[in-house]
Amino acid sequence: MSELKMPQVGASRKEIVANWQPENPEFWEKFGKKIAKQNLVISTIALTLAFCVWYLWATIAAQLNGAGFHFTTEQLFTLAALPGLVGATLRFVYTYMPALMGGKNWTFISTLILLVPVVWLGFAVQDTTTSYTTFMILTALIGLAGANFSSSMAYIGNFFPKSEKGTALGINGGVGNLGISVIYFLAPFAMGSAALGNVFGVTPAIIKGNAVYLANAAFMWIVPLVIILALMTRFMDNLPLEKPNPKNLVQIFGNKHTWALTLLYTCSFGAFSGYAAALGLLVGKEFPEIPFASIAFVGPLVAGALRPVGGWLSDKINSGTKVTFVSLIGLCATTALIAVGVDMHNFPFFFAMSVLTFVCCGFATGATFR
């Protein structure tokens, strides 16, 4: 990379970004801080919306058969698993896309792509002849939203000095992760809103005697996505980053710590994301008498809120290993007790154990990052 120069007062934004040097205190105070914070705000909002889209299917799946579809339990759970599978698989690829295409460019492209499954799903759920194969393609496309996390986290930290990078990443990932709670909280209101259905021209399904506007849960994200795309063009930037070395990428697979952390992250965040996606279907199957939609957001909200606490506690006792170990032991215990709650057909006990599972996942995920 060429030698960086100190921009002059009145320098263009393009010139400032081309000479990005956040570890230079003078540069940071005069030029860097404002631009970095603008990028962080837009990145965080975009990531929050991506998480909303990633869990969009989970809010609709439990209602499909009531709306006139005829999918088996196995098919519904398979569809619920696809967004997580695709998102997790593509995170490795997405991590390197900002360096290859530019952070602003890739954030724009990866967010723009999300409009495809959002619009398509809105029409698909209104047509009961939509095939299982079509829904498989749709849920796979929804999974792209989950991969946005890795590119967002890999890129936004480059704007900040090391002393502030942890806070920036915590805001970006922590707030973004709350998108799961946002979609679970808003979707029931949207699906029950005739006014919103009229705006979008949605045909309601009659489920248990009530008009349910399933497509609203998808269509309501069109405007926020378009707005954030417009803001990206004004307030995000492409930092000059070194292109990834393929040789270094291959070496990652030979590092035993990579595999150990991958396993731990699978057990922590994987458990969280998987259970959050499947919980609505599980309740619908085992406790059909429970109106679960109104409280579905609680577990993901708890996990998201406790994620930074897990990192803080790890720093406090200077051991992410201990926090992770205790959290995973708790996770195993609560998972077993969830099964007990199902066997007993005791929803309060089942739900309490589910929330404790999310508590353990939140602590474990934060500690694993540490």
What do the predicted segments below correspond to?
Residues 2-46, 50:
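Cytosolic juxtamembrane N-terminal segment immediately preceding the first transmembrane helix
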Residues 38-69, 275-280:
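Extracytoplasmic
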Residues 90-103, 306-319:
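Helix-to-loop junctions at the C-terminal end of transmembrane segments
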Residues 100-111, 315-329:
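Cytoplasmic membrane-interface "Motif A"-like loop-to-helix N-cap segments
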Residues 146, 166-192:
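Glycine-rich segments within core transmembrane alpha-helices of 12-TM secondary carriers
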